[in-house]
Amino acid sequence: MKKKPCKWAVIVQIFLLYSVVGWLYEEILEVFIYRTGFTNRGFLFGPYLPVYGFGALLFWLFLDSMKRQKRFGRATPLAVFLGSMVIATVVELITGYALRYFGLELWNYDHYALNFEGLIALNPSVRFGLGGLLFLYILQPLFERLIARQPRRVLTGIAAVISLVLLVDFIMQL
């Protein structure tokens, strides 16, 4: 009988996977939509944006259980969409304030309609809501099936390496 994967190993892998997915999303926007060319969108060296990893973990923590809950009926995709919008917008606002505190500005929504202090805006919030649907209904179930096939030792080893790489990258940026 295969043991269930270690919870911290799954958390680390979810964090990295969606940090990379977020980085790819941002780069695709920069290169193909805004046509500003390639720029590393984050404050870390590697191809990942931790804000997306944290957002994905919060989606997983709050919305996945809500989506699966049978006691009060399962959440509708509309509820998941709205929950994703709220979570992502709050994460983006808090992250934006934290970055400003350290003298960094990695995004600015001043030119968007319905923005707040250039840190959040309706348009990106709607996109994050759609991203939450993609995450909870398509990407995360695929990822969970992939994880379930891996031996616990492999998952723990991968998570340890990921943690070390992220820690070294963060320390190098200080």
Regions of interest found by a model, annotated:
Residues M1-L174:
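Aromatic-rich, lipid-facing transmembrane alpha helices and their immediate juxtamembrane interface loops
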